[in-house]
Amino acid sequence: MIFAIISSKSYASELQDSNKTSYNSPDFYPQYKKTSISINGFKVLLALASTDEQRIKGLSGLEKLNENEGMLFLFDRPSKQGFWMNEMKFPIDILWLDSDSRVVHIEKNLEPCIIFMACHVYTPQVDSQYVLELRSGFTNDHSIQNGTRINLNLTQEN
């Protein structure tokens, strides 16, 4: 009985520390490969969008995004990658990274697009090879700016 009480307190403490345990759930894009990265010491679980179908879908349709979750879009070569907020249900930050994984452009607190025909396409003036979508406010909370190097761990997890 005492063991169960101690165990419950430990479990509750772990759940409160979202950086350790509270990913959306095993259902956070189960069909996607995943990777974990560290951004300024903060661990983030990323679903990898590496096919055209996955890149088109992005985070659309997801109900929410926890602070320690995001999506990494992988492209074969650097180019000007445009993104929009069609069918999104929450605001996000978008970071464009070059082939050296340095942030080259940031769009913050992008709101969902309500009217399909009026959706703005966000396209930086510089080429990028990777694009990160993270919870709105993440870039400010973790002091990310142009030139920040994101250590991408492209060894995939399932």
Residue ranges and their predicted role:
Residues 9-11:
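Sec/Tat signal peptide C-region and signal peptidase I cleavage site
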